Amino acid sequence: MGKVNKYIVEKINNGEKLHFTLIDPDRVNDLGKLEETAIKMAEFGTDAFLIGGSLGVTPEEAGETAKILKKTGLPVIIFPGNINCLTPYADAVLFMILMNSMEQYYLMHAQIAAAPIIKKYKLETLPTGYIVIYGETAVAHVGRTYPIPVSKPEILLSYTWAAEMIGIKYIYLEAGSGSPKPVPPSFPAIVKKYTNLITIVGGGIRSPFIAKELASSGADIIVTGTIVEEDPDKASKIISAIKKN
């Protein structure tokens, strides 16, 4: 078990709910401000940083972002929209399959292209099934995904069972960056009830109430990004709500 995976698993086994801060390098205009935000988020209690974005991220931007985030001492994990997000300055990468994509590229070709780079960079891999729930977001458009019917959590469960059967350890339920609505609580609930997957939930989480509800329903890790960019102090209330769960 790698260092980052061990860090996450031990926290979850100790009964903790985790918070990951998502940083999109394409939206970083001031590296000094990014460092201030990162320090704030670490002080607020975030457990790790994710680096990623659906569009426009260069390896250079990802690298500069990772170097700043690592100053906090927290794990820095690549959340790749594509192989352009890979950087040797991170600690680990969510090695993802976009499970409900119609594109072969996101089902296996991207992983094949990324594998030798990840080996070269000596990044720890966290095998992750990535499922985009809604259809009206940038990630759904880029990834050409089939939306998951909100009223049919059993369809999601079939995806997660398939993920578990092929050896995936993490499942990431994505509403989409800036989504007007979060993942429904019934989704992490059914994953937690019927699988042993570590469940990550992100997108549309803009209030402490929603974050707490998702964590109570079964999410092990809550991811926020847009709210961190807009109002880091509000993000602190989300972290507190998760940690008090």
UniProtKB/Swiss-Prot annotation:
Q: Which Gene3D superfamilies does the UniProt entry name for this protein? A: FMN-linked oxidoreductases (3.20.20.390)
Recorded superkingdom? Archaea
The UniProt keywords, alphabetically, are: Cytoplasm, Lipid biosynthesis, Lipid metabolism, Magnesium, Metal-binding, Phospholipid biosynthesis, Phospholipid metabolism, Transferase
Q: Which top EC class is named for this enzyme in its record?
A: transferase
Any one Pfam family match given in the protein's UniProt record, by short name: PcrB
Instruction: List positions binding Mg(2+).
Output: 24, 54
This one is known as: Geranylgeranylglyceryl phosphate synthase
Compartments, record wording: Cytoplasm
Q: Its annotated pathway?
A: Membrane lipid metabolism; glycerophospholipid metabolism
Q: Which family, according to UniProt?
A: Belongs to the GGGP/HepGP synthase family. Group II subfamily.
The EC number(s) attached to this protein equal 2.5.1.41
What's a Gene Ontology MF term here?
Answer: phosphoglycerol geranylgeranyltransferase activity
